[in-house]
A protein has these predicted regions:
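Sec-dependent N-terminal signal peptides
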Residues: 7-13
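Positively charged n-region of N-terminal signal peptides that target proteins for export
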Residues: 1-7
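C-terminal motif of bacterial Sec signal peptides marking the signal peptidase cleavage site
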Residues: 16-20
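Exported/periplasmic ABC-transporter solute-binding proteins
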Residues: 4, 22-88, 92-291
Length: 291
């Protein structure tokens, strides 16, 4: 079941006005009722107040959540929301004007760009090939991963594991992670999935509970309850994703509408997350910043 994650932080500022007592002449009354000038802090808070709505990739949950939290802490009065619906749904949402910024864990397709959408790469993310911690297999190459995915290789003993049937766990159609995985392994529309799930978290949980399962998930989301395999003898890390030696990777993309201005608050958020100031937050969340 898709869940809705809403990160909401609001700072309410109390303003008081001092009304002067009545005076015997209009000159004194004017002095008593004159408004005090706004402080610089009040002006800054008012300028930042507003809402930023994002929608899309579940793989980007950790990264976008950390960025949204940081933005709200630095901009009192802002409401930030994130709806984890999947890359395809997020792209549709921004196209239809249902959110400010779409989130995709794949690049836009040519037809999506032609429809008036624009992509901005926020970060790079490895797609980890994950198995149950009990699995003896430690490394697979791309060709072997492809053969497992299409069902050409059906048993773990064929790749150095136990005598057990391989169960492929993947994402639903429209997922950016699935699109990236199938594109890299050249298995588009050929994968024999045992289960197709609607979120990165569901894939990780399912693999962690099945000793014969193999799946794929955002490296930023992988925890100790699953084992990430090396691919072609290269382990998935921030360094190997950044230098390109770990080949199973894809971009984290912000999607906006070409020619349509964002609200002041949404633009401020966009500028912040794509600046060098956000790099450490992105890195701490497990992705590789591009700045």
């Amino acid at each position: 079941m898709k869940k809705r994650l809403s990160l909401v932080f609001a700072a309410l500022m109390a303003l008081s006005m001092i009304a002067g007592c009545g005076a015997s002449n209009s000159k004194d009354a004017a002095k008593d009722t004159s408004a005090a000038p706004a402080t610089s802090a009040q002006t800054s808070a008012d300028a930042a107040a507003g809402t930023v709505s994002t929608d899309g990739s579940t793989s980007m949950e950790k990264v976008i959540g950390a960025l949204g939290e940081s933005f709200m802490q630095n901009n009192k009065g802002v409401t930030f929301t994130y709806n984890p619906t999947g890359s395809g749904s997020g792209i549709t949402a921004v196209s239809e004007g249902r959110c400010d910024i779409g989130l995709s864990s794949r690049s836009l397709k040519d037809e999506e760009k032609k429809s008036g959408l624009k992509e901005t790469t926020l970060a790079l993310d490895g797609i980890a090939i994950i198995v149950n911690p009990q699995n003896k297999v430690e490394d697979l190459d791309i060709e072997t991963i492809g053969k497992i995915s299409t069902g050409e290789i059906k048993n773990w003993k064929e790749v150095g594991g136990d005598d057990a049937e391989i169960v492929l766990i993947g994402r639903e159609a429209g997922s950016g992670t699935r699109d990236g995985f199938e594109s890299i392994t050249k298995t588009e529309d050929k994968c024999k999935y045992g289960q197709e799930l609607t979120s990165t978290g569901d894939v990780i949980t399912t693999v962690s509970q099945n000793p014969n399962a193999i799946g794929y998930a955002s490296l930023a989301a992988v925890k100790d309850n699953v084992k990430a395999l090396s691919v072609g003898k290269v382990k998935p890390t921030e360094e190997t994703v950044k230098d390109g030696s770990y080949v199973v990777q894809r971009p984290f993309v912000l999607v906006t509408k070409e020619g349509k201005a964002l609200s002041d608050t949404a633009q401020k958020f966009f500028d912040y997350v794509t600046s060098a100031d956000a790099s450490q937050i992105i890195s701490d969340a497990g992705a590789v910043p591009v700045k």
